[in-house]
């Protein structure tokens, strides 16, 4: 993991600038994930394309097509793992099949959750973190001067910058604090607001690497906890350690500005950075 992160940073460092989302944030999680599950690097454009379509393309037909293509792709991967299992997570899933713990349909669904959960959220988290640090030099220098803070910094960034909103469909008419909800209405539930609750956090909108606790539910909790959380955390920490060590001073390119969108997933889509090469 660390070697790949360093390689990617060293690739952009001499340039003195980059569009962080396209040049880094959308690439690093995919490359790391493909290595983690022992899939060929050549599949990156396919995987990235499906994720981009499902997460950001408003065309419902395009989303359905991307879901179908990714389902077919992963079904083939799992079929191959049944013939030639290894030590990767997909091989462990098909092993659980053989032990009667899950069925083949559940295997594909679980694999897709890992695939999409382990990539898009990291892309968005990287972009929110880097934008904040580009605009807040005191926090940036605090991390540079005290690398031991990196682990807590990841948790604080995850608390402050939520990524996912849960979509739900109302099963019946009801009144919610004066708002009329009708059966069939679609709603977005911003679960990240838990981390911004003033009754639980002092100055919740501020980023503070020295909080007593950084409790958040951006990865869910209990049996529905995100399967990719144990990969996302070290990815973000290693990125912070290596980026700050190599490019400690950076900022938003003058005359330019970040762009983003909200919806089921919060994301920055454009982040122009500069630094002294």
Residue spans for each PLM region:
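Cytochrome P450
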Residues: 1-277
């Amino acid at each position: 993991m660390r070697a790949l992160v360093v390689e990617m940073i060293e690739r952009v460092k001499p340039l003195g600038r980059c569009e962080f989302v396209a040049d880094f944030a959308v690439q690093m999680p995919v490359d790391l994930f493909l290595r983690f599950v022992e899939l060929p690097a050549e599949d990156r454009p396919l995987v990235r394309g499906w994720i981009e379509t499902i997460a950001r393309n408003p065309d419902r037909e395009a989303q359905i097509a991307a879901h179908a293509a990714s389902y077919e792709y992963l079904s083939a991967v799992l079929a191959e793992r049944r013939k030639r299992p290894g030590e990767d997570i997909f091989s462990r899933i098909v092993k659980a099949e053989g032990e009667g713990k899950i069925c083949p349909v559940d295997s594909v669904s679980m694999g897709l959750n890992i695939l999409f959960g382990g990539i898009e959220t990291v892309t968005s988290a990287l972009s929110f973190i880097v934008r904040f640090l580009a605009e807040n030099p005191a926090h940036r220098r605090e991390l540079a001067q005290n690398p031991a803070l990196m682990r807590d910094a990841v948790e604080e960034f995850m608390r402050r910058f939520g990524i996912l909103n849960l979509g739900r469909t109302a099963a019946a008419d009801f009144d919610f604090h004066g708002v009329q909800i009708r059966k069939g209405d679609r709603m977005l539930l911003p679960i990240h607001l838990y981390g911004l609750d003033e009754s639980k956090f002092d100055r919740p909108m501020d980023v503070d690497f020295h909080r007593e606790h950084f409790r958040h539910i951006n990865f869910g909790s209990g049996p529905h906890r995100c399967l990719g959380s144990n990969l996302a955390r070290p990815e973000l920490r290693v990125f912070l350690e290596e980026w700050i060590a190599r490019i400690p001073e950076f900022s938003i390119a003058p005359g330019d500005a970040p762009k983003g969108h909200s919806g089921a997933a919060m994301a920055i889509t454009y982040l122009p950075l500069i630094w002294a090469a």
